[in-house]
Amino acid sequence: MALDQSFEDAALLGELYGEGAFCFKSKKPEPITVSVPSDDTDDSNFDCNICLDSVQEPVVTLCGHLFCWPCIHKWLDVQSFSTSDEYQRHRQCPVCKSKVSHSTLVPLYGRGRCTTQEEGKNSVPKRPVGPVYRLEMPNSPYASTDLRLSQRVHFNSPQEGYYPVSGVMSSNSLSYSAVLDPVMVMVGEMVATRLFGTRVMDRFAYPDTYNLAGTSGPRMRRRIMQADKSLGRIFFFFMCCVVLCLLLF
């Protein structure tokens, strides 16, 4: 019964709307067009704050405002100012009134339009390279002076046991006598003097140590005498061992 009712309904619709009421024609889907902005209109969000046009050779200030380089150059041109008030006004950002100069402009590359040859004939120089922050290098005269003073104070303190480095040696390297213990250096000199009869240590590696105020005191002399006695005993014991070895073997 339900099937017969559906056929009757279809026949009534065919009489009302004609034979083509249930004929579905195959149509191709219409292509969806998406508007993609071109390169010429891509700079619509990057407008100059002076000419309100797409930026040409864009530069940005430290306060974050974008300008064309020709526009901001004309704004900062000090030769066309007549009064000091006008000069001070044009030394400020046109938007936020913060200080602006040619040295604080940062160029932007890869955006905006470039100047053509006809536009380049105007008296507009090239864009600035941006602010340059110079760091004080260690080889500057002030830094080298501070380094020499700190080294002089460090090596001339007698209570720490340091000794001055010879002027021939570089300030970046440590001398041989500053690394070793001065007592060990003196012991080595005494051993060399007793064994070979001459002083082997170079004076440039251990310069004028005995002429210092810290080494000419009674405490240092007493230490030298004790080291000399100890070396004498060690040398005597060593010679006895050598003689015994020669006699036994």
Swiss-Prot record:
Gene designation per UniProt: RMA1
Catalysis: reaction(s): S-ubiquitinyl-[E2 ubiquitin-conjugating enzyme]-L-cysteine + [acceptor protein]-L-lysine = [E2 ubiquitin-conjugating enzyme]-L-cysteine + N(6)-ubiquitinyl-[acceptor protein]-L-lysine
Keyword Zinc-finger included in the entry's annotation: yes
Functional summary from the UniProt entry: E3 ubiquitin-protein ligase that promotes the ubiquitination and proteasomal degradation of aquaporin PIP2-1. Forms a ubiquitin ligase complex in cooperation with the E2 enzymes UCB8/UCB10.
Tissue-wise expression: Ubiquitous. Highly expressed in roots.
Record's protein name: E3 ubiquitin-protein ligase RMA1
Pfam families, alphabetized: zf-C3HC4 (PF00097)
GO molecular function, one term: ubiquitin protein ligase activity
